[in-house]
Amino acid sequence: MQGVGSFSSPRVTDLNGDGIGDIILGSGRQEFQACDSAIIALNGLNGEMLWNVSAQDQIFGSASLKDINNDGIKDVIINGRSAELQAIDGRNGTVIWKFDKKTRYQNKARKWFNFYNPQFIPDQNDDGHEDILITNGGDVMVEAFDPNRPAGNLMIIDAQSGKIISLAPMPDGKETYMSVSACKNFDSDEYAIILGTGGETIGGSLFLTYVSDVLKGDISNAIPLATSQTNGFTAPPVWVDVTEDSIPDIVANAGDGRLLAFNGKGHEPIWAVTMKDTEAYSSISVGHFTEDNIPDFFVSYAQGSWPNLEWAKQFMVNGKNGKIEFTDSLGYLQLTTPVAADLNSDYRDEAILNMNFQQIDSIYRKSFYNILVAFDFKTNKLIPLTESLPGHNITTTPWIGDIDGDNLLDIIYCHSTSEFQTYTFDGFQVNLLKTDIPIRKPIKWGAYMGSNYDGVY
């Protein structure tokens, strides 16, 4: 893809009915620049473009997929900067609806900011169709350390029309950058939501609230789970049972370099891990990395303090007790999230991560490269999965699964094509790697926010 870049992570579904999964991505140019290929669909068979859709700013989000027009093909709902939110017919790329940036709410004019990844929730307006839960926030025009920022909003949007059903400001009145995750409550039909506030330089909190409160337009009684005075909670959390009571618990990254676990029933802390001299802006990989049956966690944090973040540091944390079982420091800063699968049939998952590095030639010129690697926690070995390729990958999480139904692992990964710059929007490459690795069990965490794209393990 020439002249554009991507912060989006690939989603896969069959759009053209050939039985092979196709690839959906967001892309764009520099901030505030329009792009005619801001949303693209690529043929999974050969990489050719199936369709492209324009946007007024970067589409950095990762799509949610749902057949909203009842034609048997999943449609694409995807988000980006400057209040970009679109629903697109997956079959042909026709825009079903766009969020109207002039939308008033309760007869008041509003300023809309970035949308973050959408989630589907049960029907909220009695039209017989699921609706969209989504956050909007983050005023990029505010100076980095200015605490006076517009409050973010948690919204329910009609998936059929893009119209607002309800809107609730953040419970602490702060901004938000988090893609929320919702999970059915353990003792009712209610859906619980994890949301976060704050940013790179502004403290914030992690909250639990419910869809019914969002529908009322008031989440001021949200349950505070954790707070940081220095950094916010920006990375998507996960719902996963680590207490073996069949109730999903909550695991989340804090921007100040902590990994936190909370009981899904009583919401009390289970364990907390602090990674010194790091900050967390990526999400969490979930897998069975140790010998027991309790899911474990692999994270890649940024070393340093924003904006002076250059290197990455990786940790594997035992889900049973919060013990750090593995640590490494590999590569330059990247904000991608690892994915997980059993690559060698030893009944333990390996974590797959895109790693950035540089080389310096004889005239001290830097060249930037990336490589896909797997961490084998049973042998503590690092396994390269690809050759090194020119360019860096800052935020695009790989997708792993079976794209063509042959029961062998396929890997989709992206990176920029600029050999001499790390942050660039002048070209990126999408790769499909076909392996001979058999898939012996369902892959639960094979994409950003998991294989179902919803943050639920």
What would you call each of these model-derived segments?
Residues 1-457:
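Beta-propeller-forming repeat regions
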